[in-house]
Regions:
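Structural signature of tandem-repeat unit edges
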Residues: 2-17, 27-40, 50-63, 73-89, ...
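Acidic/polar low-complexity surface segments
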Residues: 86-98
């Protein structure tokens, strides 16, 4: 684990993709803001971030790879900058999230539970 002191992240506006396992096992990470313009969240990008409670995902995201937020057991609320229809249109690969946890996705036109 290389990010032992990392507690929150605001990813640079110049980033368009979060690569596989970029923040894997950042156990103290509590919040993430992904900027508009990011289109892909890679495999296991935030897997095993056990303290993660807050994430903002932009409407520009079109793909969330396998296990992108898997085993983030404290993550219950996701802020999404697009509509419910845009959220549903995102390609979410298997096990993108922890299956035992119910998430609330806060969209611009209302909330979804998954």
């Amino acid at each position: 684990m290389y990010c032992t002191g990392l507690t929150n992240i605001k990813i640079s506006d110049s980033i368009t993709s979060i690569n596989a396992a970029t923040f894997f096992d950042c156990d103290r990470l509590t919040s993430v803001t992904i900027p508009e313009g990011v289109t892909n969240i890679g495999k296991s990008a935030f897997e095993d971030c056990h303290s993660l409670t807050s994430v903002t995902i932009p409407s520009s995201v079109i793909n969330m790879d396998h296990a992108s937020f898997y085993s983030c057991s404290k993550l219950k609320d996701i802020s999404f900058t697009g509509t419910k229809a845009q959220w549903r249109a995102i390609i979410k690969n298997s096990k993108w999230k922890e299956f035992e946890v119910t998430y609330t996705i806060h969209c611009t036109d209302g909330d979804l539970e998954e």
